[in-house]
């Protein structure tokens, strides 16, 4: 069997020396709504309204590389959309996963392109395929689907044959 999943407080206690946990808890104590440490990976569930500030804090703490931004549609559950950020510190040789949960009505979150410009295309892909808006994005437009495409094809409620 896998490792037992710990509560947020137990994760914080067992990883008290972790740079990411120290930095985020010091700067944004209310931003972390949950934490997991599973199979050697730290995941922090962040309140959506704090994502840009938390990313900036992690960058200042030495997490210098944004690996990707992805999305999961948990339809029909609410909150429906999980936006996930994988962030790496080359110096510390550590990775942290940030997750933010968004409701199905007008799913939106702040863009992190002011922190990591490389988020540009990742956020465009999530917008194009899932319909999640990124506030403050410099050019939020389709990247994979044609400009006249209707809807967002990776949503679980998207018609299999497309809109007709």
Show which residues each predicted segment covers:
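Terminal low-complexity/charged segments
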Residues: 1-164
């Amino acid at each position: 069997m896998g490792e037992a999943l710990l509560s947020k407080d137990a994760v914080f206690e067992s990883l008290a020396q972790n740079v990411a946990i120290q930095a985020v808890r010091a700067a944004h104590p209310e931003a972390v709504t949950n934490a997991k440490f599973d199979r050697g990976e730290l995941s922090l569930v962040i309140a959506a309204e704090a994502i840009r500030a938390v990313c900036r804090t992690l960058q200042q703490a030495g997490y210098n590389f944004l690996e990707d931004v992805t999305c999961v549609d948990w339809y029909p559950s609410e909150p429906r959309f999980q936006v996930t950020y994988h962030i790496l510190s080359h110096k510390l040789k550590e990775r942290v996963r940030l997750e933010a949960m968004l409701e199905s009505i007008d799913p939106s979150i702040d863009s992190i392109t002011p922190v990591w410009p490389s988020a540009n295309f990742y956020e465009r892909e999530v917008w194009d395929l899932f319909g999640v808006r990124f506030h403050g994005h410099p050019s939020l437009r389709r990247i994979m689907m044609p400009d006249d495409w209707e809807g967002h094809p990776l949503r679980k409620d998207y018609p299999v044959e497309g809109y007709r």
